[in-house]
A protein has these predicted regions:
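Cytoplasmic helix-loop-helix junction between adjacent transmembrane helices
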Residues: 107-144
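Extracytoplasmic gate region of multi-pass secondary transporters
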Residues: 32-33, 214-259, 263-269
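Conserved MFS/SLC helix-loop-helix module at the cytosolic interface between two early adjacent transmembrane helices
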Residues: 63-102
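Helix-breaking motifs and short loop linkers at transmembrane-helix boundaries and internal kinks
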Residues: 44, 76, 97-102, 248, ...
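Helix-loop-helix hairpin linking two adjacent transmembrane segments in secondary transporters
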Residues: 133, 137-194
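Extracytoplasmic
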Residues: 14-45, 123, 235-240
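Intracellular juxtamembrane helix-capping segments at the cytosolic ends
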Residues: 117-131, 320-335
Length: 392
């Protein structure tokens, strides 16, 4: 191996590692499902009230995603990611002051704003390091790193709630402090990393960004992202409630259902990074959606632990690569408008607001079977989207 090749690989690793740590920080938003269940228990909230937390987090994706695409055109993708990390760190320190309803609303709002900015800017930043034929697999690996943070959240929260070690009286909220410190580390490493960016010829207006939705495939992809994140947040939040409703387990035990989901989502992201280099995105997407459909059927029909865990695992694995395939398809389809399309795709994460709200009302009306029915609608749409996927 030549010295120049070794130098290039070393340079690439020095740039990609800080970016992957940012993907880990991106996963902090998934603590909202775990946190909302603990807050619901602490404050005695209804399902509809508790589901306001994840809905509030993802509401900000609707507001901030497109303006972030415009901000990237002005200050660059890396600087925009740094801003998002600062906002995220601030949001994670807020719960150290208490767990009242207003404090948690403020924390989740800032967490949503920071994550909206981060997801809009970090995903296209990868295109400055990776060629288009490796984009889907690299984004999937980033989602794998993100999923590790998601998987650890319920474990850290449960440890904080039950440990005899001193956690400054925070209990399960020690989760926020640990993730805040990691956010500060990500800020330091990314700020010290040099990344060359391709600058746009001209800045875009909000109208020009939204105009991209007039392109049929971009609109279909936008709706696909909405369904993906709705299923993701919905399963994250609802899985423990299904266990509690049907088996009567306490939250500390039922919360393992969220861990099952993220274990399989993490495994799916890791394997997907390699599978997407071997088979077409369309075939892998179809297999993933069918796995979710089977998983939803198990959640709807079963009332014992093993099949419920199986269904949750199938949904986690199936949903693990949906985002990466849709996002990469959209970026390659509109390669001349990457920042704008990125903003629109991340705006689709607003589905994380729509789905939990609908699921909360459905669950209050007919039980958790109503929440499962709402998520199944999203899975059926993704089955339709499979037919529209292009070959890259």
């Amino acid at each position: 191996m030549s010295q120049s090749l070794i130098t290039r690989r070393k340079s690439f690793l020095l740039r990609i590692i800080p970016v992957m740590l940012c993907f880990f920080a991106m996963g902090f938003v998934d603590l909202v499902g775990t946190a909302s269940n603990y807050v619901q228990q602490d404050l005695g909230l209804t399902d509809a009230q508790a589901n306001l937390f994840p809905s509030l987090v993802f509401f900000w994706f609707l507001i901030f995603s497109v303006p972030t695409g415009m901000l990237m055109n002005k200050i660059g993708r890396k600087n925009t990611v740094l801003i998002s990390l600062v906002v995220t760190a601030v949001s994670l320190f807020i719960p150290t002051f208490g767990d009242s309803y207003l404090i948690m609303l403020a924390s989740f709002s800032l967490l949503g704003i920071g994550n909206a900015i981060m997801q809009t800017s970090l995903n296209p930043l990868i295109t400055n390091l990776i060629s288009s034929d490796r984009l889907a697999s690299t984004l999937t690996f980033g989602q794998f790193v993100k999923a590790i943070a998601s998987f650890l959240a319920p474990i850290i929260a449960a440890w904080g709630a039950t440990t005899l070690l001193p956690v400054f009286g925070l209990g399960w909220r020690v989760l926020f402090v640990i993730y805040a410190v990691i956010s500060l580390l990500a800020i330091s490493l990314l700020a010290a990393t040099s990344i060359e960016e391709d600058r746009p010829v001209a800045a875009s207006s909000i109208g020009q960004c939204l105009k991209q939705l007039g392109r049929p495939f971009i609109l279909l992809s936008f709706l696909g992202i909405m369904c993906h994140v709705g299923i993701d947040v919905g399963t994250n939040t609802t899985a423990p409630k299904i266990i509690i409703e049907r088996l009567g387990l306490p939250l500390e035990d039922a919360g393992f259902a969220t861990g099952i989901y993220f274990i399989f989502r993490t495994i799916g992201c890791f394997l997907g990074a390699f599978i997407l280099r071997a088979i077409s995105p369309k075939l892998f997407f179809a297999i993933s959606v069918l796995m979710m459909l089977v998983g939803m059927s198990l959640l709807a029909l079963c009332d014992t632990l093993a099949p419920l865990y199986t269904g949750i695992g199938l949904i986690g694995f199936g949903n693990s690569n949906i985002f990466s395939v849709i996002f990469s398809q959209a970026l390659v389809y509109a390669s001349d408008k990457k920042n704008e399309v990125s903003g629109l795709m991340i705006m689709g994460l607003f589905g994380g607001t729509v789905f939990p709200l609908a699921m909360g009302y459905a669950a209050d009306a007919v039980g958790q079977i109503g929440a499962v029915a709402v998520m199944t609608v999203g899975v059926l749409y993704l089955l339709y989207y499979t037919l529209k996927i292009k070959k890259i």
